[in-house]
A protein has these predicted regions:
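Predominantly flavin-linked oxidoreductase catalytic cores and closely associated redox partners
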Residues: 10, 100-225, 256
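C-terminal auxiliary extensions adjacent to catalytic cores
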Residues: 316-372
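Beta1/beta-strand and adjacent pyrophosphate-binding region of the FAD-binding site
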Residues: 1-11
């Protein structure tokens, strides 16, 4: 079986790339799972990029117009008049993108595991049958623990965390607001989030440990017995190099195209999918990584902010919350906040002279990590 492009991994990003390429190229998608979905993923995507990327409206479960940020002892909220982000049904998103790709001519191999490369071909296995798929280009969109990345000898420098998310039945009347909790007494690895699906169901999660998530549930006055679904997964914050080698490219989580501040990877991966399509059209994968330069800068910036977060104790976080909850800071955030571009939001804050001066009095480390 010979194709122009074989995509290994039929998640949201792999299926999005298949949709971009199908109709123009002969495309195969090799997916190990027998059905879509299943990954621990809150599935929150910035509204602007959701529309820009032409993602399926039928996958949207809820719309968010604002967020409430909590520290141990204080809080502030950011609100806009229009939806800033959408929560999606991951399975519905992946399936809808696959359906689009198939209608345009892509061929899917579900329940088919990629074993490695043999004589320039992809060796795969479906149940007890082993066979080969040949292509001019191969794309590894097979997640953080990418087998394709291992096969091409990609080097990884990253921090890996386990993520845990539960769906909880409760009272979530402010269903258009996401809650973000920053409390190192509960979890010193990451923040906790509450993202309502509707007024009676929410996705609640964190990265680090399941025990930290259970501690947070108790703080939020919710019980473990209100959980109706538990999911777990892994994430990597850092760099995996190279993103392309010969006729093989890495995309999405496989390339660690992941936001270090929120662990979201869908948008970065899909934006890089456009760069990869251009590279495939040119027949030259060597230009792919350069075309994703802005995404790489965003990841590098996010890694610096994450280092700062890890270096701060809770007392300094409380003092920074005092600054962020000021009307001056909220005005800046509401004016410049971009759900998918954290660098834009944070840069706007540190470029504000009075806010920067106050923050530097709390932690001079800002100069090392953010002011460049």
């Amino acid at each position: 079986m010979k194709y122009d492009v074989a995509i290994i991994g039929g998640g949201a990003v792999g299926n999005y790339l298949a949709n971009l390429l199908a109709g123009e190229f002969r495309v195969a998608v090799i997916e190990a799972k027998t059905s879509f979905g299943g990954k621990a993923c809150t599935g929150i995507i910035g509204a602007e990029n959701y529309e820009k990327l032409n993602l399926p409206r039928e996958a949207v479960l809820n719309e968010f117009t604002g967020a409430v940020f909590y520290s141990r002892i204080q809080s502030f909220e950011i609100k806009r008049k229009t939806p800033q982000a959408y929560m999606v049904d991951r399975k519905a998103l992946e399936k809808a993108l696959a359906e689009r790709a198939i209608k345009n001519g892509a061929e899917y191999y579900m329940g088919t595991r990629f074993l490695g490369f043999k004589d320039g071909k992809a060796l795969v296995q479906r149940f007890s049958e082993r066979f080969e798929i040949e292509a001019d280009f191969y794309v590894g969109a097979d997640g953080v623990s990418s087998k394709v990345a291992q096969e091409v000898g990609a080097k990884t420098e990253a921090e890996f965390l386990s993520g845990y998310e539960v769906e909880v039945v409760g009272d979530f009347k402010r269903k258009d607001f996401v809650e973000v909790w920053v409390n190192k007494d509960i979890n010193d690895e990451f923040f906790m989030w509450v993202a309502p699906v509707n007024e009676s169901l929410a996705r609640i999660g964190t990265f680090g440990s399941y025990d930290a998530l259970m501690r947070f549930l108790r703080l939020r006055l919710l019980k473990e017995t209100q959980i109706v679904e538990i999911k777990a997964g892994n994430v990597g914050f850092g760099f995996r190099k190279p993103w392309a080698k010969g006729n093989v490219a890495l995309l999405g989580d496989a390339a660690l195209q992941i936001k270090p501040l929120t662990a979201g990877g869908i948008v970065y991966g899909m934006l890089c999918a456009h760069a990869l399509r251009y590279s495939i059209r040119r027949g030259d994968l060597s230009i792919y990584e350069k075309l994703c330069g802005d995404i790489k800068k965003q990841i590098a910036f996010g890694l610096r902010v994450r280092k700062l977060f890890k270096a701060l104790d809770q007392e300094k976080i409380e003092k920074l919350f005092e600054i962020l909850s000021s009307r001056e800071a909220i005005n800046v955030i509401e004016k410049y906040a971009d759900f998918d571009n954290h660098k834009k939001t944070i840069t706007a804050l540190v470029k504000h002279p009075r806010l920067l001066a106050r923050a530097l009095r709390v932690t001079p480390m800002l100069l090392r990590y953010l002011v460049m």
